[in-house]
Amino acid sequence: ASDVYKRQPYNQAVTDGTKIPVPINVGTSVDYMWGKSTNQVSVIETDARIPMKHALSQFVVRLKVSPEYHNDGNLTSAKLKATGAKFATTGTMNLNDGGKITFQPTSTELTWSPNTTVPAQGQQAVDYAAAIYPMTLAAGEVSLEVVIDGATYTYAIPQITWEAGKRYIYSITMRSNDAEIGGENGQSVTI
């Protein structure tokens, strides 16, 4: 009897389940999936039951407008900026260690160019999502910087652990003279 593992997307060239390449493409929110059989597979028990899990975290910028906001509401840039090397776009996943991803931090920024327009007042909020490696952030270590209608807004992200398989939503409500950002803990800050 043995365990059976599965990973998506599948890459035929990968032969070592402890070092599966998991690159992040900052242009998409593509996640990687992995799973381990919940039953032992053998000659007698040939069906493997494999529940799948997400390998990455999802970072979401949610855009809304208040009634007094009258600009176009165009989000042209979103950045995560760290005080030291915190980010990477290449890492590996270890199936024998619960799908844990390891990476060597090489960059102080992750930058996206979403070109997303904030919806008109009364419309649903618009989400811009990006896949990121799971990690723990200390208070003040990372900030979110967005450019909306040419104005730059910066928000210091409080201490948090971005876990695999979870979404971390940062809501931005555009108002006439400023923006309000709400983070993971539900508290909002005017920027």
Residues of each region from the PLM?
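Short, low-hydrophobicity acidic/polar segments
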Residues: 2-79, 111-131, 148, 161-166, ...
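Hydrophobic residues positioned within well-ordered beta-strands of beta-sheet architectures
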Residues: 59, 142-144, 155, 170
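Short, ordered, surface-exposed loop/turn motifs in non-cytosolic proteins
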Residues: 68-105
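Extracellular Ig-like/FN3 beta-sandwich strand-entry sites
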Residues: 137-141
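Edge beta-strands of extracellular beta-sandwich domains
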Residues: 153-160
